[in-house]
């Protein structure tokens, strides 16, 4: 049985593993910039200038990475 891929988790995990700088747009229009250090079902930890922020996912509109994120999985053919 093939397990379904969670795109959100894969995307955030690649941002974290590859230390890709990201701009996070919040629903209120505020922007946060930094590195994703961790995440779970409800929150994202963003590090900016050595300081961490816990951001609730329900407040996030968009993640805009500074470069493209590799979305191909290990088991996916080229």
From Swiss-Prot:
Belongs to the Hfq family. One of its GO terms (biological process) is regulation of RNA stability. The keyword Metal-binding does not apply. It holds the Pfam family Hfq. InterPro entries: Hfq (IPR005001), LSM_dom_sf (IPR010920), Sm (IPR047575). GO terms for cellular component: cytosol. PROSITE patterns: SM. Gene3D superfamilies: 2.30.30.100. Homohexamer. HAMAP family: Hfq. RNA chaperone that binds small regulatory RNA (sRNAs) and mRNAs to facilitate mRNA translational regulation in response to envelope stress, environmental stress and changes in metabolite concentrations. Also binds with high specificity to tRNAs. NCBIfam families: Hfq, PRK00395.1. Keywords: RNA-binding, Stress response. The gene is hfq. GO terms for molecular function: RNA binding. This is RNA-binding protein Hfq. Residues 9-69 form the Sm domain. The keyword RNA-binding applies.
């Amino acid at each position: 049985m093939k397990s379904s891929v969670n795109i959100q988790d894969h995307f955030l995990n690649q941002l974290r593993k590859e230390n890709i700088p990201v701009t996070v747009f919040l629903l209120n229009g505020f922007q946060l910039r930094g590195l994703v250090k961790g995440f779970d079902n409800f929150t994202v930890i963003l590090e900016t200038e050595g300081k961490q922020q816990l951001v609730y996912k329900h407040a996030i509109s968009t993640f805009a990475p500074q470069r493209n994120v590799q979305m191909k999985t290990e088991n996916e053919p080229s």
